[in-house]
Structures are given as structure tokens and as C-alpha cells.
């Protein structure tokens, strides 16, 4: 008995495999904030995939999805990049940059620079998600990232590039919120 199936209501044919379902879930979570399993189930159904609550709960667990607070203090689901069933490297450059922009808009509270360092603040529990998105975007100006619970440190390649990097990330976040 299959717990997920393609819809017959004229929607697109959707593969019924667990991997295809996981890809669809990750895609949705990376594109928009999702606050509940019922909202995610509806979004999946809108995309031609009907899933039981039990299957969805199991899928989210397998993907390592957790709820984090965005900048509006709302709990949303997030999936760490390394939890994606397909490699994040398979995403195009624009998709990686879009994910970074979206997460910056949702999670970045502040950015301060000193020389080649940038300190970013996020809601509790969100720093590693934003750091992962920044790492995946592979921005040339960033030498590396270090993330704690609610704070990230970025190291600029340029000895004086911290302020430009902080300004760039703040602009990305503001543009996403607009």
C-alpha cells in the first residue's frame, strides 16, 4: 500500500518514490516559509503529491528538518543543506544564491564588521542554517564561516572587506523582506 501517490485531478504526474517526495519537500522548504505539517501537506498536494501525516512526519525526521524562529519570531521548518537527499551541489548557482538571499531575509537580524570579519546575528537556533546557505552559495569574497547557535562569523578574503560583505548581506536581507 502506497502512502504517497500522484494526483488524478489533472495535476502533474509525480514519481511515488521516497527520494522524489524528499526532493519535493526540500524544494518547498527552500522556497518559502512553512509553519506546519498541514501547510506542507497542502503545498505538496498542490504540487500533485498526496501524503499522509505519518509519512510527512517521518520524511521531515529523515531529512533532519527542524523548526527555527525567523526574524518575525515565527517558527518555520528548515532543512540543513547536508540533510538534502540530493546534493546541494546539484542546485544551480542561481538556486544557491536565491536560497541564501531568502534565508538572509528570514533570519538575519544584524551584521557588524571589523577589518576582514563580519559577525551576523540570527534568532536562536538559526545561525547554522544561514551559514550553510552562505557556504553553499560559494561567494568568492568569503574565505569561510563559523556558526554557533545565534551568531555567525564570516571571514572576508580581503583584509578590509568585512564592511562591504556586511553591507551586501544586509542589502540581500532587506531586498527579500521588501
UniProtKB/Swiss-Prot annotation:
Superkingdom: Bacteria
Entry annotated with the keyword Transcription: yes
GO terms, biological process: L-arginine biosynthetic process; protein complex oligomerization; regulation of arginine biosynthetic process
DNA-binding among keywords: yes
One MF term in the entry's GO annotations: DNA-binding transcription factor activity
Swiss-Prot/TrEMBL keywords: Amino-acid biosynthesis, Arginine biosynthesis, Cytoplasm, DNA-binding, Repressor, Transcription, Transcription regulation
Location(s), subcellular: Cytoplasm
Signal peptide positions (record): none
Cystine residue pairs: none
Protein name, UniProt field: Arginine repressor
Organism: Streptomyces clavuligerus
Underlying gene: argR
Amino acid at each position: 500500500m502506497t502512502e504517497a501517490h500522484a494526483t488524478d485531478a489533472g495535476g502533474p504526474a509525480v514519481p511515488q518514490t521516497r527520494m522524489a517526495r524528499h526532493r519535493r519537500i526540500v524544494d518547498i522548504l527552500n522556497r518559502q516559509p512553512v509553519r506546519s505539517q498541514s501547510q506542507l501537506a497542502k503545498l505538496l498536494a498542490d504540487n500533485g503529491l498526496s501524503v499522509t501525516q505519518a509519512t510527512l512526519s517521518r520524511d521531515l525526521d529523515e531529512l533532519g528538518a527542524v523548526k527555527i524562529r525567523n526574524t518575525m519570531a515565527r517558527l518555520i521548518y528548515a532543512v540543513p543543506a547536508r540533510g538534502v537527499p540530493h546534493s546541494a551541489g546539484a542546485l544551480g548557482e542561481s538556486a544557491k544564491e536565491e536560497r541564501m538571499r531568502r534565508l538572509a531575509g528570514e533570519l538575519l537580524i544584524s551584521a557588524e564588521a571589523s577589518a576582514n570579519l563580519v559577525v551576523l546575528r540570527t534568532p536562536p537556533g538559526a545561525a547554522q542554517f544561514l551559514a550553510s546557505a552562505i557556504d553553499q552559495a560559494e561567494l568568492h569574497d568569503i574565505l569561510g564561516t563559523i556558526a554557533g547557535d545565534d551568531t555567525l562569523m564570516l571571514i572576508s578574503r580581503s583584509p578590509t572587506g568585512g564592511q562591504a560583505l556586511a553591507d551586501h548581506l544586509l542589502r540581500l536581507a532587506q531586498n527579500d523582506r521588501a
